[in-house]
Amino acid sequence: MSSIDFDEVLVHVGEKGKYQNIMYYLLCISATLPAAFLAFSQVFVSASPEHWCRIPELDNLTDLMTLEERKALSLPYVEKSDGKVKKYSKCKMYDVNYTAIVESWLENAVLENATEEDGEAQRTRSRSGLPPPPVGNPDWPVTKCRHGWIYDNRDYDSTLVTELDLVCDNSWWPSTSTTFFYVGSLFGNVVFGWIADKWGRRTAFFAILFLEVIFSIATSFSPNYVIYTALRTVNGLSFPAIYQIPFILALELMGPRYRTFAGMVICMFFASAMSLLAVLGYLLRHWFTLSLATSVPFVLLFSYYWIIPESPRWLLSKNRIDEAEVIVQRMAKINGRTVPNNFLRKMEVEILRRQGVSCNGTNSSENPESNETEDRSPPPAATPMDLIRNPNIRKKFFILAFDWVANAVVYNGLSYNATNLGVSDYLAFFIGGLVEIPSYVITWYAMDRLGRRWVLCLTMLLGGVACVSCMFVPEDAVWVTVSLAMIGKFGIAASFAVFYVFVGELLPTVLRSQAMGIASFIAGIGLLAFPYIVHLAVYSRVLPLIIMGTLSVAGALTSIFLPETLNIHLPQTIEEGELFGADFKLWSCPTLPRSVSSSPSSSSPPSSSPSLSSRSLFPRENDDDAFIKKESVDKSESVPLRFLVNGRPGNRSLQEESAATGAATTPEAKPDTENSLSMEHASTTGQETEEELARPIDKRVDDPLVAVVIVEQRRTQ
């Protein structure tokens, strides 16, 4: 593994220049469109439109009886508990001799004479000269549909449900298919995460893309729903990895200051992709056409093979420096920067030279204290049992796992439940995607000012209360129900955005990946229930909303027992994780940014190649690079070592500030670029004068760890 920190490389070639912008937006497209279409196209492909029993004896009477009159004759009413009529039954019919009833009606038909009393009735019947048709008798015997169903084709020309009659006793099939899709995603997330770590992000991306395109197209030709479900299960292996891995590749090309921004923007891309799916569904109303339209075009993404590079962070982690050098040189050229040839090799030599020389210029092997320190055995590695063994960590972990389940179930449930709101399926789904966009903007602004804890609590509470309130809305006030459901979607989308930042900041560094992997798996198991929650709409339109709203409110109430992480030094060891938040106050609010002097120690630098094998179902940022933030400093003092606070622009990392001083780091450093790394352009990024650097260290910082870094820089100048 190379000793080069890629964030330090980005100081020279640009943290977010033209190259990163091009790659980021290309990767956003490849991450969000396939993922949104793959996960949510089934909302329209397997939609269940209004339906009722088919009565063959009445099929030829369309000229004599309207649709409503045929329903009134053949279908029993479904009544509410208060006895009020709700609607016609979808799965039951009167078990009578319809031929005899119709013949009797036609035989007794007499052309009525116009009178004052029945003039209106005659005008209504003048087209046929027939009296009003017979209507069903509630006392007639009732049976299940015997001859299939008739489907309302106002919104859909055809769906898998209408083709295969997956209604009534078979209405559980679409929910089961969705559940098996997410079973596949549980294992695919682990498998492709391992592939991405072992063979590279780029390799994993094209493997996932191949899997999705092939099986999505194959799904379009399913002869029955068993085959369809099997193919969807295999297709589930590619979700959410098809979203996760391109996004992580994009993040690994950027500097740490821009990763929060990148995380929010890709959320907006995903929401836009969902709205686009609704538009496609509206334009292409046949499930087969829609299925092909949401799979075949992604063949074009294979052209990325000649555009998208491998992650240079991953290449450096595998010590493939020459391959990373090619990418870095291209990055610098497009960003308008100039770096010397063999830039990474020279940087590695320089780093090794630093590591081989102690602060006073002596070789570390000659320092007995240094050898004694090196001989100390490292502390035992953290294990999943540490999540159970430590009470405070255990409490936080179980709350986070429950909140993860709540967010995942409610978000996906509200997305799929768009077809049960009583308005156009396309319109409801389209609005559901649009309301997510402002939720991300507001969350991005709020969570760095109000804190993660209260924003998570309030957004989950908002979404939950809105959904539960649907139980008080009259049945015919459909747009009130839709509005409340959209407020629920707004709240849960916002809470999901802040949750991924919060969960990474709460867990200690040594346990972060393992804990997130376990919590992610628990959330994935909980997610298997949401299709059946949505299916409960066959009994009551608002029942799924009530259940999901209750779950969201429960998540909001548990989240207030988590400590705030805004502007707080993040835990790194098991001991720090156990102490973190142990004495927090329930109704406390986030504090103002704290100075470096108030923190016990600074955070560890981020890993150059974070593991993907245990990432979350819906990841926003990579584990170490995005979540481990540095402590803030008092901006009233000109401290040259500013730390990254919550990933916000305007604060620079330790490596950037070291480069900004323009100082060489070893006595042997020379300006000759053939022998040492050129740092000339770094001086342009510095913001301090020589007079400021000459000020006494003890007047500028109080933290001894920061002072040591400055002293080491001074000694090498």
Predicted regions mapped to residue ranges:
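Flexible cytoplasmic loops linking transmembrane helices in multi-pass membrane transporters
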Residues: 4-22, 78-172, 334-416, 584-649, ...
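Conserved glycine-rich helix-kink/hinge and helix-boundary motifs of the Major Facilitator Superfamily
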Residues: 29, 175, 206, 260-264, ...
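Glycine-rich segments within core transmembrane alpha-helices of 12-TM secondary carriers
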Residues: 31, 35, 184-185, 239-243, ...
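C-terminal transmembrane bundle
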Residues: 36, 40, 232, 236, ...
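Interfacial helix-cap and linker-helix signal at transmembrane-aqueous boundaries
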Residues: 49, 168, 195-196, 281-285, ...
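Central cavity-lining transmembrane alpha-helices of secondary-active solute carriers
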Residues: 179-192, 430-442
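Conserved MFS/SLC helix-loop-helix module at the cytosolic interface between two early adjacent transmembrane helices
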Residues: 187-209
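Helix-breaking motifs and short loop linkers at transmembrane-helix boundaries and internal kinks
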Residues: 200, 221-226, 284, 473-476
